[in-house]
Amino acid sequence: MNIRYIKNYLASKVGCHIVVKYYGSRNKRERYEGVVYQAYHNIFTIKLCGGEIKSFSYIDILTKTIQIYI
C-alpha cells in the first residue's frame, strides 16, 4: 500500500460511511464515526454524526496511527 493508492481510494469514497480508530500515545484510543467529507492533497476530512469535522493525514494510515473501516 502506498500514499497514492490511499488518496485515490479515499477520494472515491467521498460521501460513504467510515469508522476511524485512532491509536495515540499512552494507550489513548478514540473512535470516530461519520462520512468521508473531503479528500485533499495531504489530508482527508470526515464529518461526524454531530456535525463536527475531523481531519486526518494519509501518512497516519501508513504508520498505523489510525485504521479506517468503510
Regions found by a protein language model. Name each.
Residues 42-46:
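Short aromatic-glycine-enriched beta-strand elements
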Residues 1-31, 47-70:
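Short glycine-rich, low-complexity segments
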